[in-house]
């Protein structure tokens, strides 16, 4: 601190009519008493950061177990999809069986499918009916009843959903990594205080504190973080912006997506043309029909002749085909079950991250300020320096009341700060410096914590 600045502060107080209470040689004792309080608060904050680190390490272990479960579920899902594709291919090679019966039904099924699909599209979607109608007619003309007979669009559903799950997983994984890195940064910055500033951390019971939290094997990041890291770059500059904010927008976005996704999964498109529709589902249906006319095949249950195609039994002509179809259906059901399981696991992981990030934010708001002291060097006189103690001008409305005391301090590397202590607490009362140190630290926290 520059001496001219202190002189000006002291002069300013004297000019206001204040009276010096403490001789200069006593200021060091007050500084030492205040620094003792600050040291205890810093120690408490570092222990709070330790709680953050412990929580994050525990979460990381649970995360690794979750990754293993996700990988196992994904593997089983992919095996079931692969089997379904193989059975579909084998069925396609035998589609000439019962071909005459199904072709006849197909010619009556197509007009109904087109009419039903366009009716739903016109009701849900704002524009593009003419183009969609032409695309749908071309699609139906080059398709065969086999598409309906084997429920082929269910495989398309599985493949599309797999892509969405992969994107969602990558997003979650990257955000988890950012949270993990943020906690690690706060911890590492806090541990910079060990050394000249806090030599007691080098001896029991604090000895080995830092080393105890250095993992023997660094976590392997499964997903490149470049894309999302750029989007969330401000988080690295100001980690106190909030861990919870990493996951809350993603949770809301995913909730909308899943609400629509499950609706499409559980109901045929024809079922969307009801009063229970919602706008997110409508948008999804419109987009799907515009992108892929095959989505209209879901409406087969709305058309009698299409339902009859589903009921065609070719077992008398070719028992093997009937067996293949049964195997195909079994594989599809299994793949759908594992797909739902994977979604549930991702949702559980995301909910856990919301809870953990909220708790980390609470700890960070309470203790994270200590990480701002990482590059600070403590002098021989401690972190809190008392520069002036003056009695303020008595209250004219109550002259008999003791005048408040004005104290000027400097805490850490902050600017000098003027604080007021009630007049009934004298400067030699132990509570005096506790009040001063507490006020100074509270002011520092407010200016160094980003809500």
From Swiss-Prot:
Sorted UniProt keywords = Chaperone, Cytoplasm, Cytoplasmic vesicle, Disulfide bond, Endoplasmic reticulum, Glycoprotein, Membrane, Mitochondrion, Nucleus, Secreted, Signal, Ubl conjugation
Q: Glycoprotein among the record's keywords?
A: yes
- Asked if the Swiss-Prot or TrEMBL record annotates the protein with the keyword Cytoplasm, the reply is yes
Q: Which GO terms describe its cellular component?
A: chromaffin granule; cytoplasm; cytosol; endoplasmic reticulum; extracellular space; mitochondrial inner membrane; nucleus
Which GO biological process annotations does it have? Answer: positive regulation of apoptotic process; positive regulation of proteasomal ubiquitin-dependent protein catabolic process; positive regulation of receptor-mediated endocytosis; protein stabilization; regulation of cell population proliferation
Question: Signal sequence span per UniProt?
Answer: 1-18
Q: Which domain of life is it from?
A: Eukaryota
Q: What induces it?
A: By different retroviral oncogenes.
- Which positions does UniProt annotate with glycan attachment? 99, 141, 278, 355, 375, 447
Location, primary (coarse class): secreted
Bridged cysteine pairs (disulfide)? 98-314, 109-306, 112-303, 117-296, 125-286
Q: Which InterPro entries does the entry link to? A: Clusterin, Clusterin-like, Clusterin_C, Clusterin_CS, Clusterin_N
Describe the processing and modification events after translation.
Proteolytically cleaved on its way through the secretory system, probably within the Golgi lumen.
MF (Gene Ontology): misfolded protein binding
Among Pfam families, the record links this protein to:
Clusterin (PF01093)
Places the protein is found: Secreted; Cytoplasmic vesicle, Secretory vesicle, Chromaffin granule; Nucleus; Cytoplasm
The membrane topology of this protein is: Peripheral membrane protein
Q: Which proteins does it associate with, and in what oligomeric form? A: Antiparallel disulfide-linked heterodimer of an alpha chain and a beta chain. Self-associates and forms higher oligomers. Interacts with a broad range of misfolded proteins.
Please describe what this protein does: Functions as extracellular chaperone that prevents aggregation of nonnative proteins. Prevents stress-induced aggregation of blood plasma proteins. Does not require ATP. Maintains partially unfolded proteins in a state appropriate for subsequent refolding by other chaperones, such as HSPA8/HSC70. Does not refold proteins by itself. Binding to cell surface receptors triggers internalization of the chaperone-client complex and subsequent lysosomal or proteasomal degradation.
Describe the family membership recorded for this protein in Swiss-Prot or TrEMBL: Belongs to the clusterin family.
Its recorded name reads Clusterin
> To which species is this protein native?
Coturnix japonica
Instruction: State the organism's lineage.
Output: Eukaryota, Metazoa, Chordata, Craniata, Vertebrata
């Amino acid at each position: 601190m520059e001496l001219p600045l202190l002189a000006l502060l002291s002069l300013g107080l004297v000019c206001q009519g204040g009276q010096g209470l403490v001789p200069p040689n006593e200021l060091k004792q007050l500084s030492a008493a205040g620094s003792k309080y600050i040291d205890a608060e810093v120690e408490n904050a570092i222990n709070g950061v330790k709680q953050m680190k412990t929580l994050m390490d525990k979460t990381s272990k649970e995360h690794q177990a979750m990754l293993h479960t996700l990988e196992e579920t994904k593997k089983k899902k992919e095996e079931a999809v692969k089997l379904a594709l193989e059975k579909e291919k084998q069925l396609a090679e035998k589609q000439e069986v019962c071909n005459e019966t199904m072709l006849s039904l197909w010619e009556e099924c197509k007009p109904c499918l087109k009419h039903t699909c366009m009716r739903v599209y016109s009701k849900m979607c704002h524009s593009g009916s003419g183009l969609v109608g032409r695309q749908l007619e071309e699609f139906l003309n080059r398709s065969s009843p086999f598409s309906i007979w084997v429920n082929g669009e269910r495989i398309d559903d599985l493949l599309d959903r797999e892509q969405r799950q992969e994107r969602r997983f990558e997003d979650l994984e990257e955000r988890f990594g950012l949270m993990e890195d943020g906690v690690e940064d706060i911890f590492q910055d806090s541990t910079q205080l060990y050394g000249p500033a806090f030599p007691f951390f080098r001896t029991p019971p604090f000895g080995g504190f830092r080393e105890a939290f250095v993992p023997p094997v660094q976590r392997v990041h499964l997903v490149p973080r470049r894309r999302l890291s750029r989007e969330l770059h401000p988080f690295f500059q100001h980690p106190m912006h909030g861990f919870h904010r990493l996951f809350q927008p993603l949770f809301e976005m995913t909730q909308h997506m899943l609400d629509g996704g499950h609706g499409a999964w559980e109901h045929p498109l024809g079922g969307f043309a009801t009063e229970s529709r919602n706008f997110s589902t409508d948008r999804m249906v419109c987009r799907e029909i515009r992108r892929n006319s095959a989505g209209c095949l879901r409406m087969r249950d709305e058309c009698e002749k299409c339902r009859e195609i589903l009921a065609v039994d070719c077992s008398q002509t070719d028992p093997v085909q009937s067996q293949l179809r049964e195997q195909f259906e079994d594989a599809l059901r299994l793949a759908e079950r594992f797909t739902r399981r994977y979604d549930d696991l991702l949702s559980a992981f995301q909910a856990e991250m919301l809870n953990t990030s909220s708790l980390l934010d609470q700890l960070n708001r309470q203790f994270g300020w200590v990480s701002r002291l990482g590059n600070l060097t403590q002098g021989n006189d401690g972190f809190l320096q008392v520069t002036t103690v003056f009695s303020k001008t008595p209250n004219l409305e109550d002259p008999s009341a003791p005048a408040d005391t004005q104290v000027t301090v400097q805490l850490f590397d902050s600017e000098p700060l003027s604080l007021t202590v009630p007049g009934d607490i004298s400067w030699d009362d132990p509570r005096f410096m506790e009040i001063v140190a507490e006020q100074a630290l509270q002011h520092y926290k407010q200016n160094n914590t980003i809500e």
